């Protein structure tokens, strides 16, 4: 499958794993549309890719804002006449609150960041994915979606379990259009977020690392490698699956 003239959208792509995914897909030959909410950084990252002869642009919008998602993904789809790959990378912990003290606003914020965003972007992209070449959606869940998260991260785990479920539901719903839908589940990856945990809560970080069977943190490029595979023709018979990328961490938690 040639990736010439193929279009990939990567949400939350201005740093960390998202940027490495956008870079790898660009190296694979995709035109990549980077999304984020920090416009100056987004423009800078798109320029970095362009300097490496990657066809890239930045489109800023908040993935938790339904109207913004609809209008911007529609604009991207109309500009390129299709979408081939949607990577729902945007998401995050959002903070920590135990259920007894949890505010409704916090609950809604975390669910919106992880689950609503996946739904909004996927729904908006479907009409253009139908026009794509071997189209696919790639979502992001987490070990927390399997083990319900650590202290204060229960609603994060709940939201990521929802992403796991919506991945399968979308795969079932879109199979008739040959749109594949899968998810990746990164473990503890060497990103600024985990570097912050290491410096502020070293005991928590140590417990995470001790549960990684391969004895080291994953690298963002290793997640990007799997996303690249799922976006390729080599994965043409894979749908409704979640791939763990955690060095065996899911077995240790």
Q: Residue spans of the language-model regions?
A:
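Active-site loop of short-chain dehydrogenase/reductase
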Residues: 5-6, 55-58, 82-83, 129-143, ...
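Conserved glycine-rich cofactor-binding loop
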Residues: 14-15, 38
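Conserved glycine-rich Rossmann-like NAD(P)H-binding loop of the short-chain dehydrogenase/reductase
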Residues: 28-44
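Short C-terminal tail/terminal secondary-structure segment
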Residues: 93-96, 228, 239-253
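Substrate-binding pocket helix/loop in short-chain dehydrogenase/reductase
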Residues: 97-99, 103-109, 204, 208
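Alpha-helical segment proximal to the catalytic Tyr-Lys
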Residues: 127, 172-176, 236
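Catalytic loop of short-chain dehydrogenase/reductase
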Residues: 138-162, 167-176, 188-189
């Amino acid at each position: 499958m040639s990736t010439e003239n193929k279009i990939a959208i990567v949400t939350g792509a201005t740093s960390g794993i998202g940027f490495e995914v956008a870079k790898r897909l660009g190296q694979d030959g995709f035109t990549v549309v980077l999304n984020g909410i920090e416009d100056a950084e987004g423009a800078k990252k798109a320029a970095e890719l362009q300097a490496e002869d990657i066809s890239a642009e930045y489109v800023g919008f908040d993935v938790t804002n339904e109207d913004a998602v609809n209008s911007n993904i529609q604009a991207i789809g109309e500009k390129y006449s299709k979408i081939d790959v949607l990577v729902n990378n945007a998401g995050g912990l959002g903070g920590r609150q135990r259920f007894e003290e949890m505010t409704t606003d916090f609950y809604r914020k975390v669910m919106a960041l992880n689950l609503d965003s996946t739904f909004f972007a996927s729904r908006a992209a479907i009409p253009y994915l139908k026009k794509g070449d071997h189209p696919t959606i790639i979502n992001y869940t987490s070990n927390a979606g399997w083990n319900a998260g650590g202290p204060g991260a229960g609603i994060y785990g709940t939201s990521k379990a929802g992403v796991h479920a919506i991945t399968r539901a979308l795969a079932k719903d879109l199979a008739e259009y040959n749109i594949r839908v899968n998810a990746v589940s990164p473990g503890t990856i060497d990103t600024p977020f985990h570097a912050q945990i290491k410096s502020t809560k070293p005991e928590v970080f140590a417990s995470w690392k001790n549960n990684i069977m391969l004895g080291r943190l994953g690298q963002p490029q290793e997640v990007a490698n799997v996303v690249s595979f799922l976006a390729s023709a080599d994965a043409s018979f894979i749908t409704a699956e979640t791939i763990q990328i955690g060095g065996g961490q899911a077995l240790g938690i």
